[in-house]
Amino acid sequence: MTTSSSSEPSTMATLFPNFRDQEVQSAVKNLLTYSLVILIVPLASMFLLKQFFFEGLLGVSANDALTYSAIIAVVLVHVVLGIWLFAATKQEDRKKRENKQD
């Protein structure tokens, strides 16, 4: 006994976005790029600053160097998020202007 409603489409195309669409490709590429940046930049800066800048150059103790570099990493996460939000709103504004011209 199957119950299917003609008003509810059951194709996969309705459940998942069309990845051949240029807008969807751009959004996925943007998401992957910022996801990698938000992982790599803070982690790399934390360990590089701790090892080479605070301990190596300034001669700060290991615990203090870790604290300072962690604070900078947190700030960098917020900077990357701010850049991502700015880029997203800028892209959204551009789409609205294009739709108004049509």
Swiss-Prot record:
It holds the Pfam family VMA21. It comes from the Eukaryota. It is a multi-pass membrane protein. Residues 1-33, 89-102 are cytoplasmic. It is found in: Endoplasmic reticulum membrane; Endoplasmic reticulum-Golgi intermediate compartment membrane; Cytoplasmic vesicle, COPII-coated vesicle membrane. Its main location: endoplasmic reticulum. Required for the assembly of the V0 complex of the vacuolar ATPase (V-ATPase) in the endoplasmic reticulum. This is Vacuolar ATPase assembly integral membrane protein VMA21 homolog. The lineage of its organism: Eukaryota, Metazoa, Ecdysozoa, Nematoda, Chromadorea.
